[in-house]
Amino acid sequence: MGLLSDPSISTQSKLVDGLARHVRKVCYALYVAGVAWFFCLALPEFNHGTYLSENALSPGLVYPEIRIDANRLAIQLLEELQRERKDHLSTTPHAWIAAKMNEFGLETHTHNYTLRYPFGGGKEYHGKNIYGILRAPRIASTEGIVFAAPYRAASSVHTDISASVPLLLAFADFARRKNYWAKDLIFLITEQEQLGMQAWLEAYHDGDRELDLSKAYLRPGNLPARAGSLQAALNIEVQDLEIDHVDVRIEGLNGKLPNLDMFNLVQRIMAREGIASGYKQAPRKKRRHSQSHFEQNFRQMLTMLASQSSGVPTGNHGLFHRYRIDALTIAANRRATHATLKGSPGSAAVPLLKAIEGIARSLNNLLERFHQSFFFYVIVSNDRYISIGDYMPALVALVACAFLKAYLTWSTLPATNAELEKAAGWLREHEQEAELEENLEPDKFELPYGSVLIYLTATLLIGFLCNVLPLQQYFLEIPMGAAPLTTSVLSFLSLIGFVLPFVVVLPPGGLELLHVAFLLIYGCALIVIGLLNFALGLFAAVLTVPLVIALETKEENSRSTLRNTIRLATLVMNPMMVVYVIVLAMTFYQFPELPVQKIMLRAATAAMDASAYGLIDSVIYGNWLYFVICTIFLPLWIICWTLSLSKRRDYADYLDFDESPSTSPQPQSKVKTN
Amino acid sequence: MFNIMLVKFVVIFALILASCRVEADNTSVLPEGFVDAAQRSTHTNNWAVLVDASRFWFNYRHVANVLSIYRSVKRLGIPDSQIILMIADDMACNARNPRPGQVYNNANQHINVYGDDVEVDYRGYEVTVENFVRLLTGRTQNGTARSKKLLSDAGSNVLIYLTGHGGDGFLKFQDSEEITSQELADGIQQMWEKKRYNELFFMVDTCQAASLYEKFTSPNVLAVASSLVGEDSLSHHVDPSIGVYMIDRYTYYALEFLEKVQPFSKRTIGEFLQVCPKRVCISTVGVRKDLYPRDPHKVPITDFFGAIRPTRVSTDRINVTLANEDDFIFDKDKMVTKKPFKIVMESQFPSELFK
Amino acid sequence: MDSKFFKLLLLGGAVRFYFCRTPLAPMIGNRVEFATPLNSHKRMQEGIFLLQSGIDPYLGDLVHESPLILSALSGLFQKYPQFLPIFYIILDICTAALLYAMSLRFVKQKQDQQDKERKEYAKDTEELQFGPLDKLDIPELVIVAYLFSPLTVMSCIGMTSTVISNLFLAFFFYCLVKGMLIPCLLVLAFETVRSFYPIVLIAPLLLVFSRNSVRRGVAIAALFIVSCLIVAVANYFVLNSWNFLDGTLGFIFYFRDLQPNIGLFWYFFTEMFEHFRTMFLITFQLNATVLYLVPLSIKLRKEPLLLATVLVALMAVFRAYPSLGDVGFYLALLPLWKRCWKFMAHGFVVFTFFLVTLSMMGALWHLWIYAGSANANFYFGATLAFSTGQIFLITDLLFAHVKREFCLFNGQKILIDGEEARIVLK
């Protein structure tokens, strides 16, 4: 009850005052603690061994029944497909796939979809997926499992993964002869990478719903047949029937992950079949053993969080997550050229086929959706993970800085005019006497809530426009590529944000209040982003928290060099700059041989492309990254920039203002956006 | 001071020793005939309550367990009308079963325990703690079918077999509720008070099974459990073609034993209690005999698992007379004779009104 | 000043009107934080449709609005559905206007009272007294807090019937301050029959109107019961059946719908063993109604309006189906106690709590319902934290009031043995 009924009469607390004096030190200590905790997570004491918690899966209890004849079939199909690929250089051999599915006794259907590409005047693309349903023989079609393989045309720039189709078909042929399926199996072959999958999923779930077609960029059409609610999905990308290792890809849309049980299941079955498999599995030759455990773990953690933070799925499986279907991709990589091991080409794909069979039978055993194990985890090595309860403290410690600072800033907000003057550094010697007189009658000072609120709204409006403007019909009709269009709109709006603090100067006390509001919004934003996509939240926090801690609006206790450093840092922290720097670093890493100028130029175009892709991803797939950057980070940056500039009204102006009769917090600023 | 204490202890100790001796003497004094009489079978009919409390495909083994016992008691002569079979899930017809309509106890498919005619009395969601307790105590709801009632009496030997997932002091029913050892003990005590059994054989195959019989206080109960408190009961083996565990170890060996028992065999319950030594069971089989007055090694196994009643063939002539009313009414004078009364017929239709 | 008042009203209406036309409106109408089984617009539509079709709406389990409201709005719903948002906006603006008039009157009363007691006040307590400017400031703050609070705006654009409840409650407060007994009783009776919990507001009503006479108090209580009966009978004549009692009051009391909301009921009642349900039902309902009623009424007998504010706030926390619209209403009443604010130590903490928990609610709801990766516990955690924040706020307000009363008569700087004095609650 002590907390609820604070017995002291005065509202000033010594503890708060003491803390407020050392706010930076305390916050930096918290920051260091959070980052240190994050580093510690790579230590084996901080992470746990994986285990299967869903009893129903019972992985590995069945002996695989798939035999060499399935492998023979796969080889034969691959040869046929290679012949077909010569005729279909840039398209999918739909007829051949459909014929094969029909031949194996699947209920075969095709699915047509259209993409209306909005930029540069608008274009239309058409696509076609093929899927075959194997109905569960002794139960109603209420649940289904998807086995998907993307098809890449011969002319595609990506790695050839055409072996996945024969493998999938060979497994379908095997599966049809079995009577124990309790769920419908859907064998799906998509084209045009993630687009086809997205269209199929949309059609599967919302195909019969009336959509406003004028607004939809992707028109998924409808499906002729469905197979109940989808429980799980396995996406297969096989480069060749002779494989070296399997890379299990799990990151989905917006950093969502499949249930840890699903990953464990795949790992366990792959291990039983003797396939080298794992998360970000490296080829046999490149595997490094020199590194310490800690270093390996930490590297693994960072790569996982990095690929999660962009929110872009690492394979077609990621799109399933949006529909609450646990899915992952097993990407089997081609064995490097060697003659010695090529002794038994006739049985090369058998282990993989067996693994797929094992996974299918385990998934078949599922009684409800995956729910037992973790959805929030970080994989440190193939058999160790960090659960949400262990990694969240790192983020919480970082975010706590913002809230702590907000509280302390608030409790030291100037309450009277005199304090305000002191804070603003306007106290001059010859005015001290007058100030003393004033002190006898401390006139209570009203914080300019109204103006600050309007300023906040203005910044949020800029962020909102970033989302809306590039998609306005007026802009879309300009014959300009997506990248230049998006970039120019974004730069224009950032420029407005850049200029805003020069044009609009907040009334006295406004900056301090804005600072508090900024810290609160910043903290909330980080928490929410961290909940939805931990990786993004963490990286954003690690990057920006030091700056936020350093940021100060009071002039008295900060040196000018420090202020200028902060201003410079704020400029660099502009979301567009950050994107550019990241792209630059990646370009430099990829093409170290190029001269610096060329790298910078190339990075600039790549960054422009990245922003356009971000927008397209957000429109078509529902990726949040663009939205988050524009609607949250850009406004926050504008406020941050305002605070770092700390533009104050001239004191004389302020006095004039104060003499005016109105005491109510009237909006003083005239926001001139667009 | 210390010395006095010591002396006191020594005295008390001596007294205890003496009393023990006296007791020991008393037992040995019991007349031989009485002891023999106590060992004789006294039941007139047999009932079996067989319960599988867990559902879901991966619990195939529990269904196989209960069906194994069902098969044995039926083979040894208890009719279906006196077997109450509770099975929470249908494994034979599960879509995942590659051998539809069959449940095996063994990967080599030695015995199809599902057999030709299985009469399941409580199935699926009917298998609840409430129904089970109601069944035992005979407090079934109005309208319950006769096949769902345990119509045992003071002469019945009852076999209760439970299997499922258990813990210390409870057995889980269908992942949604559990019966505690106290509830079980209360139910059995109520059965005793209501004279619903003569002797009761309680058999349970689950993890920490021994915890379930700990709270029993009712007489004439013999209990056996597949594992002690703190131990897990383990499954016997996997059928890799189905992908599930087939049967639990304890029941597997129990079935192996029971398969060799014929209706008139001389096998005893005592032998049955040793059916699964730790070497093969891995868990320790727990037995509770303190409530059971007879020596298990003298009790034929068919006392519980069969329907063999003690019958005596007599060649003597026996007079069978039907009972008269006089046999029941002893005090004729005190009987109240009803006064004669007049019976008046009411007309069905008030026709006089219309006259 | 009057022109400013109208400007604010217009601006508030404009804000609501703008948001009504964005896709936000249907989204809010489906959010559990705003639309509960009691106040959701969809259910109102369903009820009116059933009523029009001659089917008893309370036979099913969907409609829990009182029959009078259903029949009163049925014409509007059926014939002019396009004007519904505007209708709700007008209702909300009426609420704001009533609150404004109420607070004007309240401040005036306070100032009069102060003039009488001024001699007894300690020195240096000017900032605790109602100043001359408060007559303008406080009503303005109240109206701003009502019109521009995101909670009430969202509640209005989601067309929840909380808008109607708020109007009635505002009317109740207005009559209470104005001293109009009969309308006050009637509106309270109506709200009581409609949503049960406002019955606690009989306490401030009795305190205001009985004027320390027990006989008057009993008479008013009897009158209240009679008016409740009248309202019930009026409801009865709409449908010619008493089913509505079970459909509204029974539904609230027995907590039949376990749909998640920002309250404390749903999680406990989903998790609890069924045979404890009756006990916890009574415990929770007692907690929401009479538990705090008696002590608070004794403590705050001189401040019936504060009592009413606190009761409305407690109602918003502990009722069976609370919505954020209820929270928005009592938050708008807080500026009335502006002179206590100096002693409210947790204002900022509570504000941060509200901000964090409300933003987390959205994220966790998404993770639970759509992504399927979180579960009910996460969401309940957020709502629990939100409720805790509200309780902090209420206790803070009460304690600040006690401190203010004390300091007003004893001065702000009391030194005992050279140290600052502390107030101990006994």
From Swiss-Prot, chain B:
Pathway named in the protein's UniProt entry: Glycolipid biosynthesis; glycosylphosphatidylinositol-anchor biosynthesis
Enzyme class: hydrolase
GO cellular component, as recorded: endoplasmic reticulum; GPI-anchor transamidase complex
Signal peptide residue numbers: 1-24
Protein species of origin: Drosophila melanogaster (Fruit fly)
Domain of life, per lineage: Eukaryota
Active site: H165, C207
GO BP term (any one): GPI anchor biosynthetic process
Pfam families given in the database record: Peptidase_C13 (PF01650)
Keyword line: GPI-anchor biosynthesis, Hydrolase, Protease, Signal, Thiol protease
Similarity comment: family membership: Belongs to the peptidase C13 family.
PANTHER family in the cross-refs: GPI-ANCHOR TRANSAMIDASE
InterPro entries, per the entry: GPI_transamidase, Peptidase_C13
Protein function: Mediates GPI anchoring in the endoplasmic reticulum, by replacing a protein's C-terminal GPI attachment signal peptide with a pre-assembled GPI. During this transamidation reaction, the GPI transamidase forms a carbonyl intermediate with the substrate protein.
The protein's Enzyme Commission number: 3.-.-.-
UniProt-recorded name of the protein: Putative GPI-anchor transamidase
Molecular functions (GO terms): GPI-anchor transamidase activity
